[in-house]
Amino acid sequence: MLSLDIENLTVAFPGLSSPALAIGRLSIDAGSRVAITGASGSGKSTFVNIVAGLERTRQGRIRWNGEDIASFSESRRDRFRAANIGLVMQEFHLFPGLSALENVLLPARLAGAATVDVIERGHALLGRVGLSRPGQKIETMSRGEMQRVAIGRALLRKPGVIIADEPTASLDAESGEAVGDLLLDLAIAEGSTLIVVSHDQRLACRLDRRITFGSGLISEDSAAAAGEAA
């Protein structure tokens, strides 16, 4: 599992009068389960892109277990993300024509890391996410089943952190509830830190901590509130 420490982070985009994201300091302990909430345009997606290394910031430090990914080259960030971060997104980014298992294994195959053990883990993960037909083509699956495949893919390389961006937003209520429960249960079982961006209040309430963004700033943090109350 990975811890996250952010210091003096500012993300600005051309044409905007104020930063899209500004965080003076934020720490997330290894093994934490954290909900990221806030209105549209509050900075949540920028936060995900920055901490996952999908975008680079030129101002601030983003340390995963002490490694500052803000200082990495793009190729090094990509390698770090592949080895340490499992991503589950609202859009599943699965490939039609490939089976559930082939989609789970695809990133490992592209990285030349699809060993026998990894393939066996792929099979096992599909069972753990509730899918009994690894050879089933993606295009024949429901959206809830597709998200289960995406969760299996995210867990394949035993990531230290799982980052999920609105993982239940495109699902119906029943499927969303099942996928949310599955994501949390698997993160606990795997020992992964979990960061979930979500408007799903039921899912957010199951997590240990809630951080709310507004206009690119942290407007509320349940951990800080708990510390003040103590």
Language-model regions, residue ranges each:
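Conserved catalytic motifs of ABC-family nucleotide-binding domains
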Residues: 158
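A short, flexible loop at the N-terminus of ABC-type nucleotide-binding domains that lies
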Residues: 1-3, 11-24, 74
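Helix-to-loop junction immediately C-terminal to a conserved catalytic motif
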Residues: 52
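Conserved ABC ATPase signature
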Residues: 137-147
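Conserved ABC nucleotide-binding domain
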Residues: 125-139
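Conserved ABC transporter NBD signature motif
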Residues: 60-68
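Catalytic Walker B motif of ABC-type/P-loop ATPase nucleotide-binding domains
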Residues: 162-165
